[in-house]
Regions:
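A cross-family phosphate/adenosyl-ligand binding-site feature
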Residues: 3, 19-90, 96-97
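Hydrophobic/aromatic ligand-binding patch that stacks against planar heteroaromatic rings
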Residues: 22, 123-128
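Nucleotide-activated donor-dependent transferases that construct or modify glycoconjugates
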Residues: 1-9
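Glycine-rich phosphate/pyrophosphate-binding loops
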Residues: 128-153
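Short glycine-rich anion-binding loops that position phosphate/pyrophosphate groups of nucleotides
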Residues: 9, 38, 81-82, 106-109, ...
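Glycine/threonine-rich flexible loop motifs
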Residues: 109-118
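Electrostatically charged, flexible surface regions
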Residues: 149-272
Length: 272
């Protein structure tokens, strides 16, 4: 199966490369197309683009990963956000359209409310619109204090999130069409993983944005860890406790709801 592998951290991210290796390991063909720059927090946006009529695409060899025939895996560095990359893949921009999308491995958690803003999850939800199943994969890399960047210095345990994703992928291939999963794993050695749990979304995400200053020309922002207490069965709490969490995500859909339509019509002067 041709599987789109993308992210929002950019084509050079080691997390992306680890996820590509996981796709190869389970016998599928990775179609690697990821942003040429960091699009973290892009959600499912399709822009802005420098040129609305053209998207830049450059070849990029994925380091340390070879395909089943031993040849290097060559991907695409794309001047676009991840959701648009999913759309371009569906349009045949990187060869025959893929049948599935996996996104990540994100540097930092995508739990709770953060799922709304995540470009990693946005890429997967965009793929669902094209009939694909998909999985967003994130590693709970801590926030560095005072820098506004996610990711502590030193080694990140990409291999843990990649190993869990590799186990789940065969199931996802056989799952009903348009199944969307959100996987978060702790940033810890695989031997220390507590296990894999279903989890609900926490009331808030694992990280949050704060305003640290303001003046006449703008606002200063920073990204900090969210130390609020979370429900025990939530994704944020379980990942903090050393579990990998899997949360099926519902795509955008209308809800059945009783609305005061007649009252609104009367208010705008339309009465039968």
């Amino acid at each position: 199966m041709r599987i789109l592998v993308t992210n929002d951290d950019g084509i050079t991210s080691p997390g992306l490369h680890a996820l590509v290796a996981a796709v190869v390991a389970v016998g599928h063909e990775p179609i690697v197309a990821a942003p040429s720059t960091d699009w973290s927090g892009a959600s499912a946006c399709l822009g802005p683009l420098d040129d609305q009529d053209r998207v830049s695409v450059d070849r990029f060899q994925i380091p340390g990963v070879v395909s089943a025939d031993g040849s290097p895996v060559v991907g695409h560095a794309v001047g676009a956000p991840p959701a648009l990359i999913s759309m371009l893949a569906d349009l045949g921009g990187f060869g025959p359209p893929p049948a599935m999308v996996v996104a990540g491995i994100n540097r930092g958690p995508n739990t709770g409310r953060s799922t709304l803003f995540s470009g990693t999850i946005g890429a997967v939800l965009a793929g669902e619109r094209f009939g694909w199943s998909g999985m967003a994969v994130s590693a709970d890399v801590p926030v560095t204090g005072g820098t506004g960047a996610v990711g502590a210095p030193g080694h990140v345990h990409w291999e843990t999130a990649a190993a869990v994703a590799q186990v789940i992928l065969p199931w996802l291939v056989d799952a009903p069409q348009r199944t969307v999963l959100n996987l978060n794993a702790p940033d810890a050695p695989l031997a220390e993983l507590q296990g894999i749990r279903w989890a609900g979304l926490a009331p808030v995400g694992g990280v949050r944005t704060v305003v640290t200053g303001r003046d006449d020309t703008g606002l200063d922002l920073d990204l900090v860890s969210n130390d609020e207490s979370m429900p025990d069965d939530s994704d944020t709490a379980l990942v903090r406790a050393g579990w990998a969490t899997v949360t099926p995500i519902a795509p955008t859909a209308a809800l059945e709801m009783e609305l005061p339509l007649a009252e609104w019509e009367r208010a705008v002067g339309r009465e039968d």
